[in-house]
Amino acid sequence: ELDKKKLPPIIADGESGFGGIYNVYELTNQFIDSGVSGIHFEDQLASEKKCGHVGGKVVIPTHEYIKKLNAARLSSDVSGVPIIIIARTDAMNAKLMTSDFDDRDSKYLSKNRTSDGYFLIENNHEMAIAKSLNYAEYADVVWCETNTPDLGFAKEFADEIRKSHPNKILAYNCSPSFNWLDKFTKKEIENFQSELSSYGYKLQFVSLAGFHSLASSMYDLASKYKGGNMSAILELQQFEKDLSKDGYTGIKHQQEVGGNYYERIGEALLGDESELLSKKDSTENTQF
């Protein structure tokens, strides 16, 4: 019943692969079975994995991460399902690296080590670009996680990558971890996405947008509803009905959680006239 042309692609967060190359291979296979169109993996140490906007991050050597990208690609090839592989580096803001074995990384490291045995990174800026240049040969899209929405660095990064890989797609996280209100004027915000796009950032997204939207809207609804204000629910339903004109389907919550799917199973097993079927007395069907 679904028109696949209308289904937006899903890009899955593969984190750091949850282990080594075998974990990445199997995880990619499971994502493919689930129907994703793309997966992004980051170059953090899996056992110390953290959000890209907090401290304590540890990145792994370039050669080790490339093996993970190859594991994901092999899984895709064996499955016979082409997917988009996105390489993300956290080197721009990480302070630690597991090893100085890879010469491509060692020049950016201090000789000093932490009490946990990790090497300190001295030049994050150049390391992030260098790592991404190496990753670009093995990934469809390259993403450098940053701790500020800096158009200057975004352009520098893009220029360096596209010197060697002129058609490489770049990704940018317009993260809610950034305090956008304090950093840009209204005019600058209006032009931010088009500026990024002109540099080559064709994949722009807001990580955790769903969380912030859901949390704030639920808080707003509860605040209005408290004290017996039923108009809050009416406003919500009217908002949903207006969105339905543009393809929004969430107003039918039974449908969204699989009601139609199980109804079809019930029809096959019980018959169309069974009194146990849910659609006959469904308020969702009669009122929406």
Model region roles, listed by residue range:
Residues 1-172, 176-178, 182-205, 219, ...:
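Alpha/beta enzyme core
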Residues 194-223, 229-263:
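Substrate-binding cleft of secreted/luminal carbohydrate-active enzymes
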